[in-house]
Amino acid sequence: MKVYDVVVIGAGPGGGSAALHAARAGLRTLILEADPEIGTPVHCGECLSELAVQNLDLEIPDHVKALDVRGIRVIFPDGTEKLLTEEGYVLEKHLFERWLADEAVQKGAKLLLG
């Protein structure tokens, strides 16, 4: 039986990022994804600020970026709005999730799909 230091449940943005960081740190990492393919079904878009990208120590490739932005306007369900002026990216979420998992696997993580 293989022993892992880290088991990540789900290969979404949070799980993929956690798996990538664990694998980069040399931890024996297993990613368990219930779906047969990462990034499907596509649920929504994804935005990341440049500060978040830097804090996560990511170098996001151009093919997962849909748009560079200088800010976003968030409209909440109650109709209130908030303007965020940080630079960042709108991402193709399914491509971003696949890229994170691929990077983690390249660093030594094992990926099991449903």
Language-model features and meaning:
Residues 7, 11, 20-42:
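Glycine-rich FAD pyrophosphate-binding loop
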Residues 71-114:
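Conserved N-terminal helical subregion
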Residues 34-72:
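N-terminal FAD cofactor-binding segment of flavoenzymes
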Residues 20, 24, 54, 102, ...:
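Short, well-ordered alpha-helices that flank and scaffold nucleotide-derived cofactor binding pockets
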Residues 15-16:
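N-terminal Rossmann-fold NAD(P) dinucleotide-binding loop
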Residues 2-6:
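Extreme N-terminal starter segment of soluble prokaryotic enzymes
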